[in-house]
Amino acid sequence: MITGELKNKIDSLWDIFAAGGLVNPLDVIEQITYLMFIHDLDDSDNLRAKEAAMLGLPYQSIFADEIQVGERTIDGQQLKWSVFHDFPAGKMYSAMQEWVFPFIKTLHTDKNSAYSKYMDDAIFKLPTPLLLSKVVDSLDEIYRLMNESQAVDVRGDTYEYLLSKISQSGRNGQFRTPRHIIRMMVELMDPKADDVICDPACGTSGFLVSAGEYLKEHRKEEIFFDRQKKDHYMNHMFFGYDMDRTMLRIGA
C-alpha cells in the first residue's frame, strides 16, 4: 500500500493536469506513462552502466554521445531526465517536443513489435512549457517518496493508484480489475513456459504483466536458461487486444 502523502502527491499531479487544460483521464494517464517511462529509462541506463563498471565489462549507453533524432544529430545526454529536468521551462519543452519524445518513439529496433506499432502515432499532448515544468517537478517528488518508501512494490502500487483514476471516471466502460484479483486468476491458471497468453480486452495490460511476473517467479530457470523458451517469452507469448488505441499504447 502507498502512503497518504504519496496519494496526495498523485492527486496533486492530476490537479496540475486539470489546471493546465488536460482533463481527459485517458490522455492524462497516457502522458504520465510516457514521462515515467522517460524517467525510468534514465534510471535503468545508469544502473546498467554501474553494474557493467563493477564487473569490468564494456557498456554502450542508449544515451550515446551523439544520437540521430530525425534529421538532427544531438548530444544524447540531453535526452536524460536527470539532465533536462533542470532546464528552464521553455528549453525543457523544446527538448521534449523536438528530441526526447521522438527519441522514445523510435527506441525499439524491430518495427513490427507492439511497441513500435502503437508508439508510431503517439503524441506529446502537454500544451505549455509551464505545465510540463510543473508535471516534471511533481513527478520528481513522487519518485522521491517512492524511493524513500519501505513497501515491497511501491512502484506497482503507485501506478495502480494512478490507474484507479480511470476506473473512477468510468469512461467508455473502462474499469480496473483489482490487482489481488488479477494475481488470484493468474495463480489459478498457473501458466507454463510454452503457453501463449491472450487478453482480448487488455486495457493497460494488467493481466499480461501479472502473468509475466508469475512466470519469472515460478518458471525462471526453465525460461531464461533455454534460448528457445526465452525467445518465446520475450517475443511470442503475450497478446493483448483492446478497442481503444490509447489503452494499447499504455499497455505496450
Q: What are the residue ranges of the model-derived segments?
A:
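Conserved S-adenosyl-L-methionine
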Residues: 172-252
